[in-house]
């Protein structure tokens, strides 16, 4: 019971922060699971990805009902992402824990930079059409699928800016496409992690409802709080956490 309560709180906090600044909860959930529950880095990545697939379904349904989605674009991204997500999960499994921690730290710093640049992304719209747009979407799936499987995150942090900048897709539609595309891709990555023994299933009972509630609360609060201040504070926290991970010492 105590473990379920702790995992619920971790999911809740991850969802709130993710909802506040428009990020998936994985970048918060993984450090919390490693720090509070003393989880192995590999298991934290696998468990996070499983939980995020469930919350991605809810988000995709919401965006679909609002009409902010492009099913064809989602299919194109998922077509390549389902293959690379499996490769990413296997690559993470093959890495020593200290190397995976360093890689995750670098990813957190990269995410923080994207977070700070977020207000300016919608003003740099690309104009790819036809075959070029298809190639952009397929290529986006290749990179974000691998990243999702390796880092245990949804991949939208990178996927959405890529679609906005390179394919000329609107911000809200890009977010909906990202959520829908990562259901099959994230599912493949999550299943691969589970097969490799990198999923702590008993934590999911608390994590999944916690993220659901937290994302809803975070999204609601986001409209009441100044966006710029939230992004800067969260980016600072991510950079600090990222540098701590990057400085993980190699075993002697």
Label each region the model flagged.
Residues 45, 172-179:
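Small-residue hotspots at the loop-to-helix junctions and early N-terminal turns
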Residues 9-19, 28, 188:
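N-terminal signal-anchor/start-transfer transmembrane helix
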């Amino acid at each position: 019971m105590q473990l379920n309560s702790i995992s619920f709180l971790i999911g809740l906090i991850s969802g709130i922060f993710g909802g506040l600044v428009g990020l998936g909860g994985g970048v918060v959930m993984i450090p919390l699971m490693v720090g509070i529950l003393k989880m192995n880095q590999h298991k934290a990545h696998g468990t996070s990805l499983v939980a995020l697939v469930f919350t991605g379904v809810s988000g995709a349904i919401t965006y679909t009902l609002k009409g902010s989605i492009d099913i064809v674009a989602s299919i194109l991204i998922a077509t390549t992402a389902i293959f690379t997500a499996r490769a990413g999960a296997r690559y993470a499994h093959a890495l020593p824990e200290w190397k995976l921690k360093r890689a995750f730290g670098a990813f957190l710093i990269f995410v923080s930079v994207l977070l700070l640049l977020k207000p300016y992304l919608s003003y740099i719209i690309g104009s790819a059409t036809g075959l070029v747009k298809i190639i952009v979407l397929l290529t986006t799936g290749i990179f974000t699928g691998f990243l999702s499987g390796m880092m245990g995150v949804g991949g939208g942090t990178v996927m959405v800016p890529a679609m906005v900048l390179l394919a000329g897709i609107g911000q809200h539609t890009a977010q909906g496409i990202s959520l829908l595309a990562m259901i099959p891709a994230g599912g493949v990555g999550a299943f691969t992690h589970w097969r490799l023994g990198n999923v702590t299933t008993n934590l999911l009972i608390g994590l999944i409802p916690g993220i659901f509630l937290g994302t809803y609360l975070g999204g609601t609060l986001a409209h009441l709080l100044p966006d710029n201040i939230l992004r800067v504070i969260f980016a600072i926290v991510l950079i600090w956490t990222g540098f701590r991970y990057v400085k993980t010492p190699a075993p002697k």
